[in-house]
């Protein structure tokens, strides 16, 4: 007697119903499934990491800008007297530029300068962190999918591409050095995070 199995090879997978034919519960499950599929895909990981990095970078940049000290500031002041309008400090349009402390300015101008500076620094930091998160997560996911492996080399390669992308405007040498530095940093982080994944020692549960 030849064993032919349980006939599972003759069973065809269930066809998905159109969305408008589903019950409210099934529609919710279908929507959750679509969201999870997108979140676990490479484009989804890249988008989520980019948005998260942008938000964290903005908060960090805002915090660092708010901790700045009162430093000399070059601000244009009207040249009302001949004593201030000297040849060394006259700017464009008859405006003399003098070095002032921020605390010497009117309160409204102080607030305007501070918020403008904080906004610029926060936006710059957010762009950098968002770029790092988006490129790193996307490249790592693509490499992991192609290699079908989850090891340290995925992060090292992603770190190299990310660092090179950040420094490519400064030339090929800077891109190479930036990629190598970011790859080394990524390798160190991965080694630290995976240091507890190994086999426990033999005396782990012994007193």
Swiss-Prot record:
It comes from the Eukaryota. The keyword Metal-binding does not apply. Keywords: Disulfide bond, Membrane, Mitochondrion, Mitochondrion inner membrane, Protein transport, Translocation, Transmembrane, Transmembrane helix, Transport. Disulfide bonds join 42-141. InterPro entries: TIM22 (IPR039175). Belongs to the Tim17/Tim22/Tim23 family. Essential core component of the TIM22 complex, a complex that mediates the import and insertion of multi-pass transmembrane proteins, such as mitochondrial carrier family members, into the mitochondrial inner membrane. In the TIM22 complex, it constitutes the voltage-activated and signal-gated channel. Forms a twin-pore translocase that uses the membrane potential as external driving force in 2 voltage-dependent steps. Mediates the insertion of precursor proteins in a 3 step process. This is Mitochondrial import inner membrane translocase subunit TIM22. It comes from Saccharomyces cerevisiae (strain ATCC 204508 / S288c) (Baker's yeast). The lineage of its organism: Eukaryota, Fungi, Dikarya, Ascomycota, Saccharomycotina.
């Amino acid at each position: 007697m030849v064993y032919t199995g349980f006939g599972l090879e003759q069973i065809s997978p269930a066809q998905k119903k159109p969305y408008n034919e589903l019950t409210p519960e099934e529609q919710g499950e279908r929507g959750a499934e679509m969201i999870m599929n997108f979140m676990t895909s490479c484009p989804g990981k890249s988008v989520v990491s980019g948005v998260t990095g942008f938000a964290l970078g903005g908060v960090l940049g805002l915090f660092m800008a708010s901790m700045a000290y009162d430093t000399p500031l070059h601000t244009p002041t009207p040249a009302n007297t001949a004593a201030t309008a000297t040849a060394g400090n006259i700017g464009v349009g008859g405006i003399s530029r003098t070095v002032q402390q921020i605390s010497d300015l009117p309160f409204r101008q102080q607030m305007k300068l501070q918020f403008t500076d904080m906004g610029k620094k926060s936006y710059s930091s957010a762009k950098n962190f968002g770029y790092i998160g988006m490129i790193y997560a996307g490249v790592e996911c693509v490499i992991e999918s192609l290699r079908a492996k989850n090891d340290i080399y995925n992060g090292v390669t992603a770190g190299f591409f990310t660092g090179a992308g950040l420094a490519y405007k400064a030339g090929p040498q800077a891109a190479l050095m930036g990629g190598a530095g970011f790859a080394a940093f990524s390798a160190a982080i991965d080694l630290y995070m995976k240091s507890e994944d190994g086999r426990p020692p033999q005396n782990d549960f012994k007193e």
